[in-house]
């Protein structure tokens, strides 16, 4: 029997999907990301969405001002696509190096997505421009038709929206974000080099039974919602395969405790404090620790055409109990796996 490794050294990872929020929440949550990750794709769905170069620059400045001294972190900004977005603004932002990618939210699919796109085909001209300049499209892949069951919305999105986009724009770089189903995993695996996907730690570790059996666990509620175990298993097999189509995207999405624990709680899991140890635990369970570095640190930069980070982090086999809550002024935020123990930790 092979001895278990006591330490792992991997190239510094990047987070290809994160919500940093703004104001006090930004200042509270950012250090958990900036101390471990070199870069992060920052979601643009603030209360006032990021739809202009000026707004992206201002938000980037607020993020950089909140980075603790000694952390070397680069936020990668995204543009929120709307029905009326000016193509010139999108192109200029990308060519100036302000926008790294553009984000497609189907209207009302998730938090702060009411400004999202109601008719995807109406913004095909934007996709044409993006394909021409090599700008990646990041997609929250769920239909929002009220007649479609919430557990079926991702699979339905593939046939109704994703495949038509890819047929029309075969060389448009697309990230199918936070995939949650066996259909999505298979679709990405069978795709080409223009299609990639991010996978969160919660969708690898849990399924809907964990959220709903024996009482509702609101801090596991996120969108896309946790699915049944056959889908969880498909995601685990996808990352264990070593395929370079899949890469790290935490979708860390913090909300104040009272907004999660309410009669109509918000969707989002705040996993930034322990994402890397959580991923490491999953990869170890799958006997796939040799693929952890590629998933965390190599596949994403390769897809985006960016250099990999030059420095490294070290994980240690030190069991660590996760905090029950994190203070944010007079409020608190509940982290992923609160009060539970993980067998890996990132060396400070």
From Swiss-Prot:
The record places the active site at 251
Q: Which UniProt keywords apply?
A: Hydrolase, Metal-binding, Pyrimidine biosynthesis, Zinc
Q: Which residues bind Zn(2+) 1?
A: 17, 19, 103, 251
Its EC number is 3.5.2.3
Q: What class of enzyme is it?
A: hydrolase
Return one Gene Ontology term, BP aspect: 'de novo' UMP biosynthetic process
> What GO cellular component entries does it have?
cytosol
Chain positions found as N6-carboxylysine? 103
Pathway(s) of this molecule? Pyrimidine metabolism; UMP biosynthesis via de novo pathway; (S)-dihydroorotate from bicarbonate: step 3/3
Cofactors: Zn(2+)
Cofactor binding remark: Binds 2 Zn(2+) ions per subunit.
Tell me, what is one Gene Ontology molecular-function annotation carried by this entry?
dihydroorotase activity
- The answer, when asked if Nucleotide-binding is one of the entry's keywords, is no
Its quaternary structure? Answer: Homodimer.
Q: Which HAMAP family match?
A: PyrC_classII
PANTHER family associated with the record:
DIHYDROOROTASE (PTHR43137:SF1)
Briefly, what is this protein's role? Catalyzes the reversible cyclization of carbamoyl aspartate to dihydroorotate.
Q: Which family does it belong to?
A: Belongs to the metallo-dependent hydrolases superfamily. DHOase family. Class II DHOase subfamily.
By what name is this protein known?
A: Dihydroorotase
**Which source organism does the UniProt entry give?**
Serratia proteamaculans (strain 568)
């Amino acid at each position: 029997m092979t001895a278990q490794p006591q330490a792992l050294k991997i190239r510094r990872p990047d987070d290809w999907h994160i919500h940093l929020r703004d104001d006090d929440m930004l200042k509270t949550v950012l250090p958990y990301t900036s101390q471990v990750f070199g870069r992060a794709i920052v979601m643009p769905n603030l209360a006032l969405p990021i739809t202009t170069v000026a707004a992206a620059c201002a938000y980037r400045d607020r993020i950089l001002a909140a980075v603790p001294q000694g952390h070397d972190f680069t936020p990668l900004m995204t543009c929120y696509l709307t029905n009326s977005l000016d193509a010139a603004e999108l192109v200029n932002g990308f060519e100036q190096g302000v926008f790294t990618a553009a984000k497609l939210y189907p209207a009302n699919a998730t938090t702060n997505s009411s400004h999202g796109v109601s008719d995807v085909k109406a913004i095909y001209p934007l996709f044409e421009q993006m394909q021409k300049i090599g700008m990646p499209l990041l997609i929250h892949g769920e239909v929002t038709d009220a007649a479609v069951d919430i557990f079926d919305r991702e699979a339905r999105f593939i046939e109704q929206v994703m495949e038509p986009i890819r047929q029309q724009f075969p060389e448009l770089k697309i990230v199918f974000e936070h995939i949650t189903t066996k259909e999505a995993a298979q679709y990405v695996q069978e795709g080409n080099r223009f299609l990639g996907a991010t996978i969160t730690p919660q969708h690898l570790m849990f399924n809907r039974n964990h959220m709903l059996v024996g009482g509702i666990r609101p801090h596991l509620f996120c969108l896309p919602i946790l699915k049944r175990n056959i889908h969880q298993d498909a995601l685990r097999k996808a990352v264990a395969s070593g395929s370079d189509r899949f890469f790290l995207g935490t979708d860390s999405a913090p909300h104040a405790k009272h907004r999660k624990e309410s009669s109509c709680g918000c969707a989002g899991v705040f996993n930034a404090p322990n994402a890397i140890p959580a991923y490491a635990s999953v990869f170890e369970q799958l006997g796939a620790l040799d693929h952890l570095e590629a998933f965390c640190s190599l596949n994403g930069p390769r897809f985006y055409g960016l250099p990999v980070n030059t420095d490294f982090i070290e994980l240690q086999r030190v069991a660590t109990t996760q905090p029950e809550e994190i203070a944010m002024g007079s409020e608190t935020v509940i982290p992923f796996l609160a009060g539970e123990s993980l067998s890996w930790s990132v060396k400070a």
